């Protein structure tokens, strides 16, 4: 118990503590007690177990990397440390499937060491759970960096979700660059102006890239749309299909078609039934 108390005390400042990784390695996660793997409760709210917090914090520090030059300007990830840590992360994912975030960080770590072939299978179970979060699709776009069409669809899916605008600035910025590269200048200007409005509202600096784009002829001559929702909807189904590509196909019976709500009720057996929106799949079912 005292050992766990020591870890909790030092864990609180891990984000700004440059020696956190050394401390965690000295402390050794194998010293976590069985109680440390259980959720805690504070003021009526459930809290992530200290074990899950520990693995996430260490993953974040691995992804941050370590200073590689005397001027402390560049960071590099330690691939050897990541490779040593991944089996431990696999164990906690397997032993504690209810932990939501370790699969996400496993995918990030695999990307960091260039192990793309294993990333998708590691990430999909988490992505299916968190599919309504924009950052899931931002990472999915990173996973499919070698497939421009799927990457494009992932950005569309991420931006189609109901999310506070201040969280979407970086995603919109990446997407605007892709749109510009495809000569989709009207759509790119729409994304850029959305970013500008958000940054102005928050009192944030526009940044060099936005400022440079605003001075270029393509931006000045482009037409701004009210939004890019039609573009998003045109491509989201391609992104959504990724989530289920590794699952076996099943045959079901259609019970009812609600043309007003554009939903289909289906049933396979007395234990498996449900409904889904068909507008992205079918025009006239």
Predicted feature residues:
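Amphipathic alpha-helical repeat scaffolds of TPR domains
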Residues: 1-73, 97-108, 131-142, 169-170, ...
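Alpha-helical adaptor scaffolds
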Residues: 74, 99-116, 121-163
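Alpha-helical positions within canonical tetratricopeptide repeat
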Residues: 81-84, 118, 150-153, 187-190
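Inward-facing hydrophobic residues that define packing positions of alpha-helical scaffold repeats
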Residues: 82, 89, 123, 155, ...
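Structural detector for short beta-strands of small beta-barrel domains
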Residues: 223-261, 285
């Amino acid at each position: 118990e005292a050992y766990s108390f020591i870890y909790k005390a030092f864990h609180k400042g891990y984000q700004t503590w440059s020696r956190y990784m050394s401390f965690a390695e000295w402390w050794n996660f194998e010293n976590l007690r069985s109680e440390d793997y259980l959720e805690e409760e504070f003021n009526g709210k459930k809290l992530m177990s200290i074990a899950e917090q520990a693995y996430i914090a260490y993953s974040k520090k691995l992804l941050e990397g370590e200073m590689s030059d005397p001027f402390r300007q560049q960071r590099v990830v330690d691939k050897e440390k990541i490779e040593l840590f991944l089996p431990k992360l696999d164990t906690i994912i397997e032993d504690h499937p209810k932990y939501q975030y370790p699969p996400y960080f496993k995918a990030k770590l695999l990307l960091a060491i260039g192990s793309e072939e294993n990333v998708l299978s590691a990430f999909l179970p988490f992505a299916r759970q968190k599919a309504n979060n924009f950052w899931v699709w931002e990472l999915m776009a990173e996973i499919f960096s070698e497939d421009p069409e799927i990457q494009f669809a992932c950005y569309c899916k991420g931006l189609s979700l109901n999310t506070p605008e201040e969280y979407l600035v970086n995603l919109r910025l990446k997407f605007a660059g892709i749109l510009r590269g495809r000569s989709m200048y009207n759509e790119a200007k729409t994304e850029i102006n959305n970013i500008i409005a958000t940054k102005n509202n928050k009192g944030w600096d526009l940044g060099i890239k936005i400022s440079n784009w605003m001075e270029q002829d393509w931006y000045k001559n482009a037409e701004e749309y009210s939004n890019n929702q039609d573009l998003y909807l045109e491509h989201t189904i391609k992104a959504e299909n990724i989530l289920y590509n590794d699952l076996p196909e099943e045959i079901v019976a259609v019970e009812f078609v609600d043309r007003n709500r554009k939903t289909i009720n289906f049933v396979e057996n007395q234990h498996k039934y449900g409904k889904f929106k068909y507008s992205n799949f079918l025009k006239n079912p």
